[in-house]
Amino acid sequence: MPPKKAAPKKLHELAPEVRVGLKIDDISKKTYIVGKQFATGGFGRIHTCTEDGKSQQMVMKIEPSTNGPLLTEVVVFNRILKKDMIENYKKAKKIQWIGLPHLIANGYFTYNNEKMRYMIIPKYATSLEAVREANGGSLSAKDSLTVADCVLGALEYLHDSDYAHADVKAANILLEKPNDFSSAVLVDFGLAHRTTNNVDKPDKKRAHNGTCIFTSTDAHRGNNPSFRGDVEILAYNLIMWISGSLPWLSLEASPDKVFEAKQKFVGGLPGTLQSILTNQPAPVAGCITTMFDVSRKTDYTHKVDMAKLRKKVTEAAQSASTGAQKKPKMTPSRDTTATPKRKSQRAPRVESEDEEEEEKKEVEIKPKKKVQRSRKVVEDDDEEEEVIIPKSTRSRKTKEEGTPRSFNLGMTSSTATSDRVAKKIEMKYKRLATNKPSLVPVTVADASSCESQYESNEPGPSSRVVKKRTSEERDANGEVQLKTPALVSPDVKKTKYKSGISSATKASPTELRRVPGVRNFPKGRRSMIIKETSARYQEKRATRNTKPTFDDSSCSSEV
C-alpha cells in the first residue's frame, strides 16, 4: 500500500478586522490600546496604537497566529533589533544614528475566539514610496543616493548580525521626518533570512522569491537571500527612483521574463545603465555600476565591503547636488508612459495644495492692510499736539487746519492777567496729578470771581496792585477769548463747580473722614489730608465770620 500524501500546507490568511479601542495586555504588564487601521501588509493589518495613559502613537502589526511572515519578523526583532542591541552597536561603531526600528512589544491575544499575534514598533512620518508617487514617480539623484546611504548603513548592521533583508524597496523605507531623506529607516523583515547555513544550491520552490521587479538574480534562481543580493536589489531600486522606471516593469506578471531581462541588463553594463540615466552626471551612473560589479564579484556566502560602497555613494550624491545647482533647467521631462502609477510630473519639493492656497491668500491680503496714521489737532497757533488714534476707536475726524478752539470765560480782564489765571489752572492740574491732597482744582468761575476782585482799587492781602482793563481789549460781547492749554479739561463750564461736599463738612474732621473718596487714601496719608483740609476750612470760615477780606489763596484752592 503506497504511503499517504502529506496534507497540503495551509495558505496564509488575512487577519480579521480588530475593533478600535481594544485593550491588549503585554507580558510586561503594560496595556496597549488598538487605534485605526492605516495599511495592510502581506497577510496582516497595520494599526496605530498607544500605551494606556500615554499619547505617543506607535505601530501595531496584527496577524493570525498561524501565519508565518509576522512570526519571522518577530524572531528577527527579538534576535537582533532590541533597543539595547542597537545602542551597543552604535557605541562600538562610534555612530550617532542608524536607520533601523527597534522592538517595543510583541505577544498574543485572543479576538473572537481566534488567536492573534501582534508586534509593536515606533511610528514614522511617511514612506519613501508615498513621497516618490507624490513627485510623479521619481526622486532626484541626490535624494535617492542619500536614502541609499542610509539603507547601506542599515544593511551593514543586518549583515554583521548574519541576516539578509531580501526585500529592499521604497514601500519598506520610512522617513522619520517628512522630506528628510537622511532619516530613512529600513523596515519589514518578513523575508529576512539568517545566512549562517547558506549554500549556493538553487531550489525551484524558492524561485523568484521577493518583489519580482527588484529581487536579486540569486532569488530568481531559487537561492536563499544573500549579502550580495541585498546590494543588487538596492541598485535596481536606485534606477527606479532616479529614472522613474525599469526596463522590465511591463513584464512583472512573468517572473521568468523579468529574470531574463535582468540578466541581459547586467551583462550589458555599463552601456545599458547609461542609456537609462542619460541626464545624470557620470558619477551617478558609475556608483550604480559599482554596486552591480560588487554584487557579481562577491562570493555567495561572503559579506560586502559596505564602507567602500558608502564612500562611493557619498561622492556620487555630492556630484549630483553640484550638477543640479549648475544646470537646474537642463533636465528634460521624463516619459510617463513607462510607469503606470505616475499620473503627472510634479516639482521635486513636496508641497500640499492647502499650503499653496494659504500662501496665495497671505500674498493677496497683505496689500489690503491699511496703515493708521497719526492726525494732528491744532490747539494753538504756535503749538501742535500730535494725537495718535488707536485702530479700535472710531472718533470723529478733526481738520488739520482751522480756527483754534477757545472758551469764553465770561470775564473782563487783560491779556496778561488771563494768561496768568490760565497758568494757575494749569499748575493746579499738574499738582493734582501728583496726588497732593491739599490742592483742589479750581473752575473757571472761581478764576472769574478772583479777577473781579483784582479790578478793585483796594489792596488785598497779597499787596499787589493790578491795573484795570480797558474796554479796547474786550471783544464785541465784552468778553475775552482765552485759548486753553491741553491740560485744561474741555468739560469746564462757566458755572461754579459743585462737589456735593459742603464747607461745614470739610471743616469737620469727623464728617470729612466719612466722605467715600477720603477712604481711598492710605491710613497715614488720610489723617494728614483730613487734618490739613479741616484746618484750612475752619480758618476760612472764621475769617469770613469776622471780617470779609480778600484772600488770594482762596481763589486758587476753593472748590
Curated annotation (Swiss-Prot):
Composition bias, kind Basic and acidic residues: at what positions? 533-542
Post-translational modification summary for this protein: Autophosphorylates in vitro.
Region feature Disordered, mapped onto this chain: 315-419, 448-559
Q: What class of enzyme is it?
A: transferase
Query: Protein kinase domain location, by residue?
Result: 32-388
* Keywords assigned: ATP-binding, Cytoplasm, Developmental protein, Kinase, Nucleotide-binding, Nucleus, Phosphoprotein, Serine/threonine-protein kinase, Transferase
Subcellular location(s) of the protein: Nucleus; Cytoplasm; Nucleus, Cajal body
Superkingdom of origin organism: Eukaryota
Enumerate the GO terms in the molecular function aspect. Answer: ATP binding; protein serine kinase activity; protein serine/threonine kinase activity
Give the residues annotated as active site. Answer: D167 (proton acceptor)
Q: Where does ATP bind?
A: F38, A39, T40, G41, G42, F43, G44, R45, I46, K61
* InterPro entries for this protein: CK1_Ser-Thr_kinase, Kinase-like_dom_sf, Prot_kinase_dom, Ser/Thr_kinase_AS
Biological process GO terms, please? Answer: cell fate specification; DNA damage response; establishment or maintenance of cell polarity; gonad development; regulation of fibroblast growth factor receptor signaling pathway; signal transduction
For bias type Polar residues, the affected ranges are 405-418, 449-460, 545-559
Name a GO CC annotation attached to this entry: nucleus
Which Gene3D superfamilies does this one have? Transferase(Phosphotransferase) domain 1
> What is the catalytic activity of this protein?
L-seryl-[protein] + ATP = O-phospho-L-seryl-[protein] + ADP + H(+); L-threonyl-[protein] + ATP = O-phospho-L-threonyl-[protein] + ADP + H(+)
* Database matches in PANTHER family: CASEIN KINASE-RELATED
Q: Report the sequence similarity comment from the record.
A: Belongs to the protein kinase superfamily. CK1 Ser/Thr protein kinase family. VRK subfamily.
Q: Per its record, how is this protein called by name?
A: Serine/threonine-protein kinase VRK1
User: What organism does the record attribute this protein to?
Assistant: Caenorhabditis briggsae
Q: What is the lineage of its organism?
A: Eukaryota, Metazoa, Ecdysozoa, Nematoda, Chromadorea
